[in-house]
UniProtKB/Swiss-Prot annotation:
UniProt source species: Streptomyces sp. (strain KO-3988)
Record-given protein name: Ent-pimara-9(11),15-diene synthase
Function statement: Involved in viguiepinol biosynthesis. Catalyzes the conversion of copalyl diphosphate (ent-CDP) into pimara-9(11),15-diene (PMD).
Summary of pH dependence: Optimum pH is 7.0.
EC code(s) of this entry: 4.2.3.31
Lineage: Bacteria, Bacillati, Actinomycetota, Actinomycetes, Kitasatosporales
Assembly description: Monomer.
Alphabetic keyword roster: Antibiotic biosynthesis, Lyase
Amino acid sequence: MRARHRVALKVLADLRSWAAEYPQVLEATPIEALAISTAAISPWRGANELRLSAPDVRCGPTPLDDHVEQNVRSLDELDDLFGRCEAIVRGGDRDDGHPLLASLSGWQSALERAPHYPKLAGLWGDRFAEALRGERYDWTAGLARDRGEGPSDPQEYLTYAASSNAWITHFPRWATSDRDDLLDGLPVLDNALEAIEVAVRLSNDLATFERERAEPGQNNILMYDTSPDWVHDELDRHSRKAQEQLDPLATAGFPPAVELLRLLDWSVTFYSGADFRGWGSDRDLTGPSGLPSDM
């Protein structure tokens, strides 16, 4: 337990250093939650190994979400931003035109030096693009919902569950792995992580619905033709699917499978008690912490 705490503190210090370079976009990022999560999912890894595995600050899923929700005003602007993100990820292009893009450029450059990255680059580019398509869907659906015209089919929503960014935030653990047999297990890991992505999306939606229902431009599964019971059933179904795929590898002592099971357990458990927002350095000190009283 003490070792995990030390790792979390080292990761937190690293994230704070990175956030200080881009205060325009990262000052409201809940970096404490990200540091704790990173250490909890991979407690046997050292802080140096996890430096690339805390990309919520670096490549921007959390700050990118914020920027898109708060600052993007047109679909053309959104498509331009996402196109530049893809150019960085797929082509290695450096882009300093915006702090988010500069941060992503630096992180991508470091990621490309990871041992398994060359063989995983194509998969990384495809899954990153899939996450951006999910973000785009959420943005357009939220805009339509503000006009009273939002989509209602929950299965359509789940098609874009990559907007949870669970896949792209976990990927660095594969790229930096020292396991020579990682690629042998990759098909199972990839399929399981896609199921986990849906579970994370649903558990996040359950945690954030009360906040998001009062905010413009939001898109949440509970805004569709669903109920909390339906969402919990789908969450359980996708969790079981991932567990059934991963259990044989985890039982055999394959660390990448264990990490995915820990990612699933940590995410669902955390979101069952709290929204990631509002209990760390991003907390509004004039209001309640948002942290569950038993944590």
